[in-house]
């Protein structure tokens, strides 16, 4: 009978503890679906999009001529002139800035709108990373809960076998009722851990739903197993090419270049062209020397007006300010590029470190599985103690926790690289 129980315990140990390496994907990985949902529903991303649209409207409204001016003068009492009496004057005047001023204005507004677009992109991409961060943290907690439940079941099986051994006539010298009490105390620790992790999982699910901007108790479809993601072939050129922060700084630099050109154009003269039409009545008493044929004749008068930008202090200050902004933006671009490259190099090292840790914990878990099988046999034979079994179970739980944390960390490192190359960029779908 003891051999039968020993065989059952070994089989249960193998099935339960090696189940952590078994993949069961009855539910689809819906992470991509949740990322899209967050991008569409998140208020911060929506706010950035509306800000971008507002700047696009500003760009469309700029770069056009000012409205023409219409003037109308009516004389209740006709004004005597040399060739008649003036009763009405109508004039139209159109202002024209210096050549290229309107184009520079529109270019500046368009580049500012592009900078706002890149800022909106960056917010959406950062949100997708936050979704993945909470997703993998939640999966790691689910894995830890599964491991603890499995180990608790194993502990209960050991307890039942020990109880039978204690009551049977085949009880060995090492069989003690105190071991049953120690197992019950250990089981209470397991129950507390399970309750604690369940509370953490509940809070993480609520936070995840709030991140998606939906009711906090909404159902979340999670895969059954947390699997390590394959590390991509990392290229710095992809980061430099696609990162929205760098593109935003480039757009800002182009906007300040256009602003400098605009300041220069404002320092040039502007002019206005117009025409004036005068309505005259005949003068019954024309002045001496007046031409009779022109008495009471209406007249057209072309007009031109030119501004003289003689006060240069404002223009020079605006141009200098634009030059300083260009210099500051270029330095910010180099600083951001260096920071991203530093992050890129560190990311490669962290991925290698995470993969080594996963391999280490997998190896240790396999060894501890075999150790537990041997300890159970030795305990029944009286050559090992319950302390050894409990200590090995604690080490097993600790290694399983570390492995799940390392797998989640590796997945997050991959997600961080995807964030740097803007993989989850849904701006084109808006």
PLM regions: where:
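Acidic, low-complexity, intrinsically disordered peripheral segments
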Residues: 22-24, 402-430
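Bacterial Sec-pathway N-terminal export signals of envelope proteins
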Residues: 19-69, 74, 96, 174-178, ...
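Bacterial N-terminal signal peptides
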Residues: 7-15
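Periplasmic alpha-helical coiled-coil/stalk elements that build and connect Gram-negative outer-membrane
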Residues: 126-241, 350, 354, 396
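Positively charged n-region of N-terminal signal peptides that target proteins for export
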Residues: 1-4
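Small/polar, glycine/serine/threonine/aspartate-rich low-complexity segments that form flexible
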Residues: 22-28, 68-101, 105, 225-229, ...
